[in-house]
């Protein structure tokens, strides 16, 4: 929910305080003491916010406030407390009477930081700057060392793929490798691992050996099928006239058979034509 506002802030005065306002606030607190800061403006007759009255009193109007810069002892105290508490200025101011948290913070930012850096001390960690710089450089070195193996891991698969493709081309031959390129394209050739490549190479050698054996067996069977019948050429010199007569007889018989077939077929055609013409007349 958050803290409720101290007042409505309607018709209240803003800006720097006047001497009369400071006098009213000092007289009220010295006579009545510190009470609820929300009620102080109404009781003292000030047109200010309760928070503004509190800050004006604690930072400027308190009688126990110390004016001026911090002493060497106070600076050492602030450095020791800052190394333990960090930027908790209100807690640091509680250990330094007469000093406000705002005053200590301003003095830290304007004076103490510069002194520590000149002494070679980091104002945030209170360690020597050389050690802090080394600690800052170590993560960068780790990042650089991690990026080099990452680049190597990205380059190794590319080299392996190129080697695998060259081995595949040697094992399959130019024709089959061109068929793969036409089907998939150069960029779409599937990546093949080394184990599968060894299997492909062994299968290709086995298939080549089986294909050569099958070709040889097919050739032998084909030659067996093409074996021609043996002819007896006995008494070739003595029976030339008989062979010539036999050949002449075969030719004459074939010519007669062809003539008889063609003759009968032509007669059938003539008979069919005559029958069709006679039926057409009647």
UniProtKB/Swiss-Prot annotation:
Alphabetized GO MF terms: cis-regulatory region sequence-specific DNA binding; DNA-binding transcription factor activity; transcription cis-regulatory region binding
Annotated GO biological process: L-phenylalanine biosynthetic process; negative regulation of DNA-templated transcription; positive regulation of DNA-templated transcription; positive regulation of response to salt stress; regulation of lignin biosynthetic process; regulation of phenylpropanoid metabolic process; regulation of secondary cell wall biogenesis
Keywords: DNA-binding, Nucleus, Repeat, Stress response, Transcription, Transcription regulation
Biological role: Transcription factor that acts as a positive regulator of abscisic acid (ABA) signaling in response to salt stress. Acts as a negative regulator ABI1, ABI2 and PP2CA, which are protein phosphatases 2C acting as negative regulator of ABA signaling. Binds to the DNA specific sequence and core element 5'-ACGT-3' found in the promoters of ABI1 and PP2CA to negatively regulate their expression during ABA-dependent salt stress response.
Record CDD domains: SANT
Annotated Gene Ontology cellular component terms: nucleus
Domain HTH myb-type residue range list: 9-61, 62-116
PANTHER family the record matches: F14D16.11-RELATED
A Pfam cross-reference name: Myb_DNA-binding
Organism: Arabidopsis thaliana (Mouse-ear cress)
Tissues showing expression: Expressed in chalaza of mature seeds, cotyledons, rosette leaves, cauline leaves, veins of stems, mature siliques, sepals and styles. Expressed at low levels in roots.
Induction, per UniProt: Induced by salt stress, drought stress and abscisic acid (ABA). Down-regulated by salicylic acid (SA) methyl jasmonate (JA).
Protein name: Transcription factor MYB20
UniProt-listed InterPro entries: Homeodomain-like_sf, Myb_dom, Myb_TF_plants, SANT/Myb
The entry's DNA-binding region: 37-61, 89-112
């Amino acid at each position: 929910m958050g803290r409720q506002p101290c007042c409505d802030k309607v018709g209240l005065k803003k800006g720097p305080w006047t001497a009369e306002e400071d006098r009213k606030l000092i007289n009220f607190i010295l006579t009545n003491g510190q009470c609820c800061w929300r009620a102080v403006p109404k009781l003292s007759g000030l047109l200010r916010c309760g928070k503004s009255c509190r800050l004006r009193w604690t930072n400027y109007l308190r009688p126990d406030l110390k004016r001026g810069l911090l002493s060497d002892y106070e600076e050492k105290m602030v450095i020791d407390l800052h190394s333990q508490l960090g930027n908790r200025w209100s807690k640091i101011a509680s250990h330094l009477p007469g000093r406000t948290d705002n005053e200590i913070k301003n003095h830290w930012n304007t004076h103490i930081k510069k002194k520590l850096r000149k002494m070679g001390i980091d104002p945030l960690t209170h360690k020597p700057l050389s050690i802090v710089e080394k600690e800052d450089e170590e993560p960068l070195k780790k990042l650089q060392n991690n990026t080099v193996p990452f680049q190597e891991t990205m380059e190794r698969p590319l080299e392996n793929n190129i080697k695998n493709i060259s081995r595949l081309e040697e094992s399959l031959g130019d024709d089959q490798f061109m068929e793969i390129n036409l089907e998939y394209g150069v960029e779409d050739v599937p990546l093949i691992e080394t184990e599968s490549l060894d299997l492909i190479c062994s299968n290709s050698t086995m298939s080549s050996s089986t294909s050569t054996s099958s070709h040889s067996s097919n050739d032998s069977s084909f030659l067996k099928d093409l074996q021609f019948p043996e002819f007896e050429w006995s008494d070739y010199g003595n029976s030339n006239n008989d062979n010539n007569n036999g050949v002449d007889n075969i030719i004459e018989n074939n010519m007669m058979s062809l003539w008889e077939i063609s003759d009968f077929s032509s007669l059938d055609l003539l008979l069919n034509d005559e029958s069709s013409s006679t039926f057409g007349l009647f």
